[in-house]
Amino acid sequence: MKLEKIIKGITVNEIIGDASQEISGINMDSRLIEPGHIFVAVKGTQTDGHTYIQKAIEKGARTVVCENLPETLIENVTYIKVNDTEDVVGKLATTFYGDPTSKLELVGVTGTNGKTTIATLLYNMFRKFGYKTGLISTVCNYIDEEAIPTDHTTPDPITLNKLLGRMADEGCKYAFMEVSSHSVAQKRIGGLKFAGGIFTNLTRDHLDYHKTVENYLKAKKAFFDGLPKTAFALTNLDDKNGLVMTQNTKAKVHTYSLRSLSDFKGKVLEDGFEGMLLDINNVEVNVQFIGRFNASNLLAVYGAACLLGKKTEEVLLALSTLRPVAGRFDSLRSPKGYTAIVDYAHTPDALENVLNAIHEVLNGKGHVITVVGAGGNRDKGKRPLMAQEAVKQSDKVIITSDNPRFEEPQEIINDMLAGLTKEDMRKVISIADRKEAIRTACMLAQAKDVILVAGKGHENYQEIKGIKHHFDDKEVLRDIFANE
């Protein structure tokens, strides 16, 4: 594709060089540059791409998009100066990869909790309907049946457009995508056209990056502010920020709720470890999910499917056949008669939701043992809150490590313990070794008890000092059960 066509949709301050040349690729990472590529110099949170311009040229970059021109300009290299490279990179990638979202029905899911479940269930549902479908999520990306491993909730804009381009080329009609607050703030979704957006909820998370809850809210809201008139905005009325999210959107607003009058109204009629009986818009449906938070997620899935033109009867039938997402309220039964639940809950609110769900089903007939940690080099303010929530709703709590990254595990544990009283501490054991913590919980559990292993969910690693060591909560539990 010619450079002049790729840059047509962006505001350019200055062009130095030949804009008619053929471009073979686009990248923000100088290490991935190949001959004939565009290098976009983006100022990131860790490094400034402008310092790698020379390296990119040495690797064969024919064009450099930058905010500041380098002191020395190289002959036969085209320089394009713009105000904000972070803002234009998504638009450049969208054009280069053939505007993939004009050929797909793309739905974005944003919120603190529930994104993975909702996006994945919509992907599974639309495949059941017989459509080729794409998924972009924390757990894994999919182009119909093909799995593509992922590192981020939302990939960088170039990877994202390349992925969406492949989905469109391979005949996908729908794509469902988690939209993180980071991706909105860093303009990773720039240039994409959404058919719809879903808001789940907003609670404390990622304050290491956003600094304040208000900034976090603004990042989520910006997604809805950017939706076109042709899109739908489906929001959760049970969250106090539900209507705030959609107050400035051009999209058509629809609502879902378990408590209030709404377009998609739900009610939990029965709840057990095998599933729930729900009432959705006055029709009963059995589902294989547990807990009110999952009832809310399923309402969002139901609403989105209906807004995408599916008939209510086929949506309800599909809902009844869907299974929980990996690492989200994943339950395993021990030979000793207790239940272990592995869940990704890594915020105080998510922990509260999962523990509430456990108590609703247990109904006082067993004890709750919670194994929980907090991530290193992340929002320190939520650490004591996580411990407090665990203690409030558990009979025994084992504080342990969870991706300590570049911090010492014991220091993170100490931060969590700092939020507890002497009375609370009677319930608490701290064991830095996560495997030992899970083993101890299993030794303490009796028949009918429930162990919650929180924080990692689908993750199969422990990140320590920059290295990801293999670690899987479910594997550990299965090994323990095999020897009981």
UniProtKB/Swiss-Prot annotation:
Subcellular location: Cytoplasm
Positions with a binding annotation for meso-2,6-diaminopimelate: 378, 402-405, 455, 459
PTM characteristics: Carboxylation is probably crucial for Mg(2+) binding and, consequently, for the gamma-phosphate positioning of ATP.
Enzyme Commission no: 6.3.2.13
Motif window: Meso-diaminopimelate recognition motif: 402-405
Pfam family, one: Mur_ligase
InterPro entries: Mur-like_cat_sf, Mur_ligase_C, Mur_ligase_C_dom_sf, Mur_ligase_cen, Mur_ligase_N, MurE/MurF_N, UDP-N-AcMur-Glu-dNH2Pim_ligase
Record's keyword terms, sorted: ATP-binding, Cell cycle, Cell division, Cell shape, Cell wall biogenesis/degradation, Cytoplasm, Ligase, Magnesium, Nucleotide-binding, Peptidoglycan synthesis
Residues given in the record as ATP binding sites: 111-117
Modified residues (N6-carboxylysine): 220
Pathway: Cell wall biogenesis; peptidoglycan biosynthesis
GO CC terms, sorted: cytoplasm
Chief location bin: cytoplasm
GO terms assigned for molecular function: ATP binding; magnesium ion binding; UDP-N-acetylmuramoylalanyl-D-glutamate-2,6-diaminopimelate ligase activity
Reactions catalysed, as given in the entry: UDP-N-acetyl-alpha-D-muramoyl-L-alanyl-D-glutamate + meso-2,6-diaminopimelate + ATP = UDP-N-acetyl-alpha-D-muramoyl-L-alanyl-gamma-D-glutamyl-meso-2,6-diaminopimelate + ADP + phosphate + H(+)
Amino acids binding UDP-N-acetyl-alpha-D-muramoyl-L-alanyl-D-glutamate: 30, 153-154, 180, 186, 188
Any one biological process term the GO annotation gives: regulation of cell shape
Gene3D superfamilies xrefs: Mur ligase, C-terminal domain (3.90.190.20), Mur-like, catalytic domain (3.40.1190.10), MurE/MurF, N-terminal domain (3.40.1390.10)
Cofactor or coenzyme needed: Mg(2+)
Highest taxon of the lineage: Bacteria
Family designation: Belongs to the MurCDEF family. MurE subfamily.
Function: Catalyzes the addition of meso-diaminopimelic acid to the nucleotide precursor UDP-N-acetylmuramoyl-L-alanyl-D-glutamate (UMAG) in the biosynthesis of bacterial cell-wall peptidoglycan.
The protein's name: UDP-N-acetylmuramoyl-L-alanyl-D-glutamate--2,6-diaminopimelate ligase
Annotated source species: Phocaeicola vulgatus (strain ATCC 8482 / DSM 1447 / JCM 5826 / CCUG 4940 / NBRC 14291 / NCTC 11154) (Bacteroides vulgatus)
Organism lineage string: Bacteria, Pseudomonadati, Bacteroidota, Bacteroidia, Bacteroidales
Gene: murE
